[in-house]
Amino acid sequence: MNQEEWIAELKGIQPALFEGLRRMVAIPSIRGEAEDGAPFGKGPRQALDEVLAIASELGFQTKNIDNKIGYAQYGEDRPDGAYYGIFGHVDVMPLGEGWISPALDLTVRDGRLYGRGTLDNKGPILSNLYALYVLKEKGVTFDRPVRIVFGTNEETGFGCVKHYLTKEIPPTFGWTPDCKWPVVYGERGRLRVRLSVSSDKVSGLYTFANEKLLHTNHRGEELGIAYEDSDFGMMQLRGETFGVEDGRHYVEWTMCYPAS
């Protein structure tokens, strides 16, 4: 298939995507008191059940992990357990004030979608689910299964993902289509770097940090990695921290591009 044909397929699935999103937006999946079978409250549990039902209707394998998190999977398990992971969440923040249209009723107005969770994160994670559905229906295969993982506690602590990682191995590769995805995700770059040394070389570590990180313009020139362009401006280095772990001294810093 060429690009135009893929675009046509994606446009064709939009009505089904909007209907799925309507079902999800209608659920007030705000964290509540823990109950039997609903560790983060009734709303998040209901949202998890609903999104797994949607995924099942689309022909995906699904799994609910202790009512805290679940996933839809395309492709069979490998002996080594490796998979690609797309992580999102179906819990939302409280509805708040000032809604022009009903917060729990998906509204299309002037080509835009309104409703709690359309941006963070029900809309983006469902977009990935339906895009994967198109690939599945067209017979596209991958060298390992693809999972779309639906958390229920992202807004209040990530307890869902922490629990997931006690039951499942981390993905080989993946992404998080959260918030204004893919625009913001594509525009922002973050890299957290750690440099560690044994205790007998700690003097050199602090010399490096002073000369290359702390007493600089924080643009990476001393490291030979300075970069800027007209669209995103200058890369910046910041967030330097020092510590000791497992007997090794380290310095960490963040490379930010763009800086905002």
Region spans (language model):
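A structural signal for short hydrophobic beta-strand segments in well-ordered beta-sheet cores
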Residues: 62, 106, 239-242
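Active-site metal-coordination/substrate-binding segment of hydrolases
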Residues: 80-150
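N-terminal helical capping/dimerization or prosegment-like subdomains
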Residues: 2-85, 89-96
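Short beta-strand segments enriched in hydrophobic/aromatic residues
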Residues: 76, 90, 152, 255-257
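Fold-independent oxyanion-binding glycine-rich loops
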Residues: 67-68, 88-90, 110, 152-153, ...
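Hydrophobic residues embedded in beta-strands of well-ordered beta-sheets
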Residues: 70, 112-113, 249
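Midchain, well-structured core segments that form catalytic/ion-binding scaffolds
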Residues: 162-260
